[in-house]
């Protein structure tokens, strides 16, 4: 039976480096950042939703399902990942951050190939120099271990991924795909690139 995969755009952060503005809603080339992600995921998976803890009504205008973290007291991206895994009706969930408008068009394909070839429950991207755990594919079988990990006070994605023998997948030929917009200056820098 074929592996089923859904995708979630992670937009639940506090955006401290962006003066608290909702990163996913900031405009790049006239379009909110999250919509760039949505567009690049559309041909990779059949079902996409958004994890957002603020401005949910605005995100819902995109026509996709929007949900907040179930755990209280903002606990980082793993909290959104846990909620997504617990809600999923697919075997795996593909995760991407809302502030990475150039994400790889073959992200799902390469991460899926890695988990299938290794029989691992998760895979995540690297660009040849840095790990990018927010670009990841996780089995829904990880929801109980992830809940236990968060309840024990841990928050580091890579630590959890390594504990569960996550496969780091090389995207060094697409390094630019992992550029993320952490500040308004980052967005300004890329306004005219790829236009």
Swiss-Prot record:
UniProt remark on domains: The N-terminal domain determines nucleotide recognition and specific binding, while the C-terminal domain determines the specific binding to the target protein.
GO CC annotation terms, alphabetical: cytoplasm
UniProt name for this protein: Molybdenum cofactor guanylyltransferase
GO molecular function: GTP binding; metal ion binding; molybdenum cofactor guanylyltransferase activity
Encoding gene, per UniProt annotation: mobA
Protein family membership: Belongs to the MobA family.
Catalytic reaction list: Mo-molybdopterin + GTP + H(+) = Mo-molybdopterin guanine dinucleotide + diphosphate
Keywords tagged on the record: Cytoplasm, GTP-binding, Magnesium, Metal-binding, Molybdenum cofactor biosynthesis, Nucleotide-binding, Transferase
Domain of life, per lineage: Bacteria
Pfam families, alphabetized: NTP_transf_3 (PF12804)
Cofactor(s), by name: Mg(2+)
Keyword hit for Magnesium: yes
Amino-acid positions noted as binding GTP in the UniProt annotation, renumbered to this chain: 10-12, 23, 51, 69, 99
NCBIfam families: molyb_mobA
């Amino acid at each position: 039976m074929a592996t089923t995969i859904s995708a979630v755009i992670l937009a639940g952060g506090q955006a401290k480096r962006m003066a608290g503005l909702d990163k996913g809603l900031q405009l790049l080339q006239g379009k909110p950042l999250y919509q760039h992600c949505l567009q690049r995921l559309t041909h990779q998976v059949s079902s996409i939703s958004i994890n957002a803890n603020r401005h949910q009504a605005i995100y819902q205008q995109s026509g996709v399902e929007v949900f907040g973290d179930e755990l209280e007291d903002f606990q980082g991206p793993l909290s959104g990942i846990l909620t997504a895994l617990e809600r999923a009706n697919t075997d795996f969930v593909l995760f991407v951050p809302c502030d990475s408008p150039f994400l790889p068009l073959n992200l799902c394909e390469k991460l899926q190939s890695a988990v299938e070839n290794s029989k691992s429950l998760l895979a995540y991207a690297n660009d040849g120099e840095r790990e990018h755990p927010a670009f990841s594919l996780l089995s829904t079988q990880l929801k109980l271990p992830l809940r236990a990990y968060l309840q024990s006070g841990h928050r580091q994605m890579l630590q959890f991924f390594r504990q569960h023998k996550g496969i780091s997948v090389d995207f060094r030929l697409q390094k630019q795909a992992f550029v993320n917009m952490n500040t308004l200056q980052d967005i300004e820098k890329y306004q005219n690139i790829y236009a």
